[in-house]
């Protein structure tokens, strides 16, 4: 397990979560010289966590549900001693997202103890047209800097 090796495992439907995952990876790679691998959980449901010291998990919320691939991954995975952080892209308020989704997942997997959780703005499309867009790439980049410090310190 490498100290600087980080996995970003995510699921995306409309692309917002993937955009955030790539922005976070870019900050960690370019500014903190961390080795980062991206895995789309819709394609690889069970990535091997052995080589990773840090795991970042990203998901969106659609129809008031966390993406199924991520929910199952969080519920069933034993993260061992790895450092885990979670981000969600949503149009809902932060506290409501944490209460409705993160707290429920932690009850199902009490060993899951994320170092940090962030809610980033989401985007809503109807019939292929964006009707609401609260995407904030700069906020995801700032959060990446914050978690990089936590990864190095703890």
Mark where each language-model region is.
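Active-site signature of alpha/beta-hydrolase-fold catalytic machinery across serine-
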Residues: 23
């Amino acid at each position: 397990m490498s100290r600087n090796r980080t996995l970003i495992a995510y699921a995306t439907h409309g692309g917002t979560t993937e955009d955030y995952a790539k922005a976070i990876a870019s900050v960690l790679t370019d500014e903190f010289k961390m080795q980062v691998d991206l895995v789309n959980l819709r394609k690889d449901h069970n990535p091997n966590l052995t080589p990773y010291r840090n795991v970042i998990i990203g998901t969106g919320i659609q129809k008031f549900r966390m993406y199924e691939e991520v929910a199952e991954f969080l519920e069933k995975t034993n993260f061992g001693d790895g450092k885990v952080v979670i981000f969600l892209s949503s149009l809902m308020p932060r506290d409501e997202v944490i209460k409705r989704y993160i707290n429920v997942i932690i009850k199902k997997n009490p060993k899951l103890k994320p170092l940090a959780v962030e809610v980033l703005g989401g985007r809503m499309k109807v019939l292929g047209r964006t009707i609401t867009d609260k995407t904030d790439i700069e906020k995801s980049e700032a959060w990446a800097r914050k978690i990089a410090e936590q990864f190095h310190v703890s």
